[in-house]
């Protein structure tokens, strides 16, 4: 027999954790609800050695002046440069999540705009134009353990939460991810 209560919990999780900004490594702006909208992508380079592309997600956040993300990668690292601008008269708290794909806790160190996150499989370095708080939380996963009920919906992975300390009219954040050696 199907446990309808458990199924309702799974449906709620889809709508609150998986299909929202919480479930993705993207921008969240406190007080703004993102919407589905075109996000033009410019590919500067894409080949066997890596790539370089820029996504303009501004239209996805009504009320935001700009969100531009540049992503560059090769075999050694992934570099993500986020440029976010709010209207001068409406500064905002900006937040990013980085899903690490591990159930192991991360070691977080740093202050102000410079932070480092280390976990068994890699490192994440943050350099920001504004002060940040960096924390971690456990979130359910349905990517690493796709669809495996015994180790899927209830599998929790580590998610790093990067948040501006206070409302800002703009923030530039560079995130560099490297695999452990």
Annotate each language-model stretch with its function.
Residues 2-181:
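CBM-like, beta-strand-rich accessory domains located in the C-terminal region of large
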């Amino acid at each position: 027999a199907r446990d309808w209560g458990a199924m309702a919990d799974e449906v709620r999780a889809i709508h609150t954790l998986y299909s929202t900004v919480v479930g993705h490594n993207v921008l969240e702006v406190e007080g703004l609800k993102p919407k589905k909208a075109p996000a033009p992508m410019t590919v500067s380079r894409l080949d066997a050695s890596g790539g370089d592309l820029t996504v303009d997600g501004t239209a996805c956040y009504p009320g935001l002046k700009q969100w531009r993300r540049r992503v560059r990668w090769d075999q050694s690292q992934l570099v993500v440069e986020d440029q976010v601008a709010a209207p001068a008269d409406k500064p905002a708290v900006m937040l990013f999540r980085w899903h690490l794909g591990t159930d192991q806790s991360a070691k977080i160190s740093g202050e102000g705009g410079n932070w480092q996150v280390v976990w068994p499989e890699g490192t994440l370095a943050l350099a920001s134009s504004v002060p940040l708080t960096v924390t971690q939380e456990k979130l359910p996963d349905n990517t690493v353990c796709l669809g495996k009920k015994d180790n899927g919906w209830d599998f929790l992975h580590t998610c790093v939460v990067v948040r501006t300390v206070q409302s800002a009219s703009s923030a530039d954040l560079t995130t560099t991810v490297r695999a452990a050696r």
